[in-house]
A protein has these predicted regions:
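Short, small-residue-biased leader/transition segments that mark boundaries at the very start
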Residues: 1-2, 186
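Short beta-strand elements that form the blades of beta-propeller/WD-repeat-like
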Residues: 3, 36-41, 106-119, 169-177
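Long, internal scaffold/assembly segments composed of regular secondary structure
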Residues: 3-59
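Blade-edge beta-strand/turn elements of extracellular beta-propeller
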Residues: 4-20, 72-91, 130-144
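Beta-rich catalytic cores
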Residues: 25, 105, 125, 149, ...
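Structural signature of eukaryotic scaffold interfaces centered on beta-propeller domains
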Residues: 25-32, 91-106, 152-168
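Short, solvent-exposed loop/turn segments at conserved positions within beta-propeller repeat blades
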Residues: 50-68, 120-126, 179-183
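Generic long, charged, amphipathic alpha-helical segments
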Residues: 121-176
Length: 187
């Protein structure tokens, strides 16, 4: 892991040793005194195994079974210490936050729920939306329903919103497709 001071040059790069993982999406990053805090989705297995019963496309399908969870890293710029751990262990990814809070402490993150293979999941299908309170680790979950799948969501703050407003005052937007009525999609 590396950081470069926003006021520095390439010579200011710092390396930090973390538990091995793959990070597809970061929710947010901010400073707290000597610490840089980063929330994101952590995968411990970026090279999943294929199952033999899926034929010649099995290796491609294996990569579409993303296993990741909401995770927090803390990097101390003064001492080099790293603290890290799960915020939650639910399989989620494609995380978003209110863009007004990019680079400053944020409380909420919105993730797509991805069922694991042993939960009846197949490939990268989003079956629900999960709202995390990263301060408490609590979550609210909305399932789209049987045969209904969502797209990567975006967060849209209400018109005219600033960081003086409630961080959660906006809209999480995803396109949802009902595969039972393929000619119909919902926002």
């Amino acid at each position: 892991m590396l950081f470069r001071s926003r006021h520095g040059s390439g010579g200011d790069i710092r390396w930090f040793d973390c538990e091995p993982c793959y990070i597809l999406h970061v929710s947010n990053c901010w400073e707290e005194g000597d610490w840089v805090v980063m929330d994101g989705c952590r995968s411990t297995n970026p090279m999943p195994s294929a199952t033999s019963d899926e034929g010649e496309l099995s290796h491609m399908l294996a990569y579409m079974r993303l296993e990741a969870n909401n995770y927090r890293w803390r990097f101390n710029l003064r001492t080099g210490e790293v603290r890290e751990g799960d915020i939650d262990d639910l399989n989620t990814e494609f995380n978003k936050t209110n863009p007004l809070y990019a680079g400053v402490k944020s409380r909420y993150a919105y993730h797509q729920r991805i069922p694991l293979l042993e939960e009846g999941g197949h490939t990268l299908r989003f079956t629900g939306l999960v709202k995390y309170d990263n301060n408490t680790g609590s979550r609210q979950q909305w399932d789209y329903g049987d045969g209904v799948f969502g797209s990567e969501a975006v967060y849209a703050p209400k018109a005219g919103a600033t960081r003086d407003n409630d961080e959660d005052d906006g809209y999480v937007i995803t396109l949802v497709t009902d595969t039972r009525e393929i000619g119909r999609a919902h926002v």
